[in-house]
């Protein structure tokens, strides 16, 4: 019995201290991780290749796209929104939407990749969230491990959808309100969470009125319109998430609404062409078909070991050449 307790203690300690997911996710459940500890560790060629691909893509997202557009554009706009026109503020918001995605998902990709190299499987944590045609779909694709944790431990504990429609909508708002508060004791985080909660409740209400089934996908122009609306709502909420205080958020919104000045865009593009080139690349990669990513991943898996090593060396060289400052801390480290 003592030996069994010692083994359980070692197993549990290993689970809570497993470094790839320790600081910023993905949130790995004990029921998914502990059974893997009991099995003999084995790293297949596919696991090794997929791990290298994920580390490569995560480092590319974080060190090349996220850090560069943050240091050279996004931080300047958000630090002093009143110094810039509405079009500059809007581009800053678009930049932050890409920055935070590349930062969060880049860390998750690297964590999942490192775990694969060590013989462990983590679940997917980001699934092209800006492709979402509704706010409900967005939360099925964004930080999936956090979304499922909030659902299992807050939403369902509050009653979920078991106590009528009104209670379901209220539970969604309360869950997201608490999710916002978890990020920090700030009105901006509270508003960010509450806005998402209200949007989720309104979408559930709309689905109930129109008779649409859970998980039913829209198609064609209807889906394109849904993606555009959802993306801009999420960007609106990012304004509150990113800004240090409520006044800065209101200043930014005021600039976008009252002093847009679109005629400045050509000058903006000329002055920040490297930033906009990276933003365009980032969004193109994000909205590319999933089959393209799968094809590239399969190609990496088939590469010999020397090819995989050379790929990482080239990426590290590009990171060194492009960085304009020290590598920035991951955004999620502050939460």
Residue ranges and their predicted role:
Residues 3-7, 11-334:
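Membrane-embedded transmembrane alpha-helical bundles that form the catalytic cores
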